[in-house]
Structure formats: structure tokens, C-alpha cells
Amino acid sequence: MINFDQISVIDDFLPKEQFEQISSLVMNTTENRFPFFIQKDVADDAEISGPWSWYATHTFFIEDEVHCVHFPLIKELFLNKFRNELNVMSGLIRARANFYPWTPDVRQHNWHTDYPYFRNNAALFSLNTCDGYTSFKDAGKIDSVANRMIFFNAHLEHCSSTTSNEYGRYNINFNF
């Protein structure tokens, strides 16, 4: 059982066929048609700025609205597992894919919390293995490893990073 009083890491979260289905879709390895939208700053990084401090997102679902034709796949692969197998989710707030670009050296973004104005939990699914990571202020770094899921209390201060050994760092973020 997942305990949100601590950070939980599950490797090989999806069966191989399901993982390949979602990773090839989001990482554009099949049709080159998955749209990402540029965000100027990561986590309101006003003090951390520069040509490297951007990322791109693709929202599947946010605040009771489906935003993507691929949401049924997200529901099938992840949300049903969250509800029925892991019993960690009653309602979804947001599901979003993130792309952090390559930089010559790994760069860390600003510390932040997700939806700080109400209690919620998060799950972060890595789509590729790279030298990027998610860092928790009080718990250290967790490497980006393909098919790895991290569950945590979204009020824990955390941050993302870029990658220096892949084209980009890809993940899917869930808040519930």
C-alpha cells in the first residue's frame, strides 16, 4: 500500500507492452504528432531564468475537464490502476506530460509544491531514462528511470531538472 507520509518509488510500474504504448506516443517515436506547448518558466522560476529554464507541457486533464483525445489511454493505463489496484486516488485534479530539454549540464529548477492551497497527492511517471531527476528538499534526488513511478505528498517541496545525456527528459505528472 502507498503511504503518502513518505515517498514511494515503484520500478517497472506498467507491463512492457503498456509502457511502450504510452512512451512511444508521448515521446513521438511513432508518428511525430504529439503536441507539446512551451512554458516560459518552470515552477515560477523568476529568480532562475535563462534560455535553459523552460519546459513544454501537454495537458490530458485538468480541473474536471478532459483536454486531450488520448485521455482514455491515460485512464486505462494509470487511473484505473491508481483507483482499483493501489487504492490511492478518489478524484483527479490534473494529468499532464512534461518535456524538459537537453542542456550541456544538468540544471535544477526552483523548489515548489503542487496546488499548495489544498491537500493533494502526486504521482510522477518517468518515460525515459536519463541523468535528470526529481529532487525533494528533505529527501534527496530520485533519478529519472523509464517506467518508474514516484508517489508523494504534493506539499513536499520538490523540483525538476533538465538532462544532459538525452534529447529531453519526459514524464507524466498526476495530481489527485
Stretches with model-predicted labels:
Residues V106-W111, F118, S126-V145:
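A short beta-strand-loop-beta hairpin characteristic of the jelly-roll/cupin
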Residues A123-F125, E166-F176:
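A short hydrophobic beta-strand segment most commonly corresponding to one strand
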Residues N110-H112, E157-N165:
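Short beta-strand His + acidic residue motifs that chelate non-heme Fe in jelly-roll/DSBH
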Residues N84-P104:
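A short glycine-rich, His/Asp/Glu-containing loop-to-beta-strand
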Residues W102, I142-H158:
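Conserved metal-binding segment of the jelly-roll/cupin
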Residues T30, S135, F174-F176:
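Double-stranded beta-helix
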Residues M1-M89:
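Non-heme Fe(II)/2-oxoglutarate
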